[in-house]
Amino acid sequence: MAFPTSSAQQAETNRKILEEIQTKKQLLIGLGSTANQMPAPQLLGQPTVTAEFVQNVSATPNAAGGIAAPRSAFNPTSSTTLGFFIPQDSYFGNSFIPVLPRLEPVPTPPAPNSK
């Protein structure tokens, strides 16, 4: 790799590097905003969540006595899991309990006898 010999070449190299970083930053910011607009993937066998349940979860009081705002955690979680959630009152700030389905273990085939 050749190094610039004069301060003018050094300044030009620094300017190009900064421009490249700025364009990459703008690209990443643009990708981040479109990723937030994409819907979450839906899984097969996912239970439906009623509006009443969402209201119960969002109105659960937290340890400070105020209304917790679990909706920011509840929505992405409920859209990406096979389980469901039960609202609860908690002094620790846990506004809902996850309930996951019990899956039966896959039977393993018997090992062949080697003689």
Curated annotation (Swiss-Prot):
Pfam families: SOSSC. Disulfide bonds: none annotated. One of its GO terms (biological process) is DNA repair. InterPro entries: SOSSC (IPR031821). One of its GO terms (cellular component) is nucleoplasm. Belongs to the SOSS-C family. This is SOSS complex subunit C homolog. The lineage of its organism: Eukaryota, Metazoa, Ecdysozoa, Arthropoda, Hexapoda.
